[in-house]
């Protein structure tokens, strides 16, 4: 049975949607025989309330999350999903290709609460796939 992986990240520009699509495709090319990727861009339509409910339902079905953490700070919705998934005991792998630091100090990738919720934060798609493979193998 395939494990469900929730792909979290901002979806407010074509560039963000294209990047999310690229991440999903890369993950599935390497691990598609073992996982199913749930991406809000493909499941969510309607009012803000319907979007919220469908995303929470999808999060509840997934034990693993990939969180896109690029930008001057983490997207608000992504940060909420990270916290929710962490509180439910899920494993979160962040990907941050943005070379700007967005945390409390020079060694922080992002906000301490988001960073502390992730089992790892990686900087490339190859490292993301490798980390997901380790989680699936454990």
Model features per residue range: what roles?
Residues 1-138:
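Conserved catalytic or regulatory cores that recognize and/or transform ribose-phosphate-containing ligands
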